Amino acid sequence: MDDAVAAGTREVIENHDFMSWLGMELVEFEEGRAVLSIPHDEKLTNIVEGSRGTIHGGVTATLVDTASGFALRTTFDDPLEPALTTTDLDVTYLRPARSDLRAVAEVVRAGGSMGYTDVKVYGTAPDGEQKAVVKGSASYRLFRDRAGRSETDGDR
């Protein structure tokens, strides 16, 4: 991906209220792959006794979904104007997340109308080693013939 596309993608994240509230950042953006991060923040953690201080599972699920979408954006002619939507999201929690998160999403297949990704979300274990805290996959409907158009634009 060229620098202008990566910069435009970073701007999408910065201007998206939810993504920016999470502190999400684009780390890497290349053909078939996107790496996103979210810093550990108390506002994102569970408050239930026994889980206190661990990042809420919805945050990691969001990271799986968003990283998948950005990885699939790289398969469009214009990654800044894609039309796509999640059709299936699978998230498996491997261990509690208690640190900054880093999601690595890779495109498994991107056809004319469907795209599939595999994702791993990493956190830092108490011993300092990076370990997978979540593994996930996603399926997306790709609207290649309608890139840049909203669902309300109707069929043309």
Regions found by a protein language model. Name each.
Residues 1-28:
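N-terminal leader/capping segments at the start of a protein or of a new domain
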Residues 20, 32-34, 85-89, 99-101, ...:
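A generic structural signal for short beta-strands and their flanking turns/coil linkers
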Residues 23-54:
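Catalytic strand-loop segment that frames the active site of acyl-thioester-processing enzymes
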Residues 37-39, 104, 118:
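Beta-strand residues in well-ordered beta-sheet regions across diverse protein folds
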Residues 50-65, 69:
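Compact, glycine-rich, soluble single-domain proteins
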Residues 69-104:
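Hydrophobic beta-strand-centered segment that forms part of the acyl-chain substrate-binding groove
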Residues 96-99, 108-156:
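HotDog/MaoC-like acyl-thioester-processing domains
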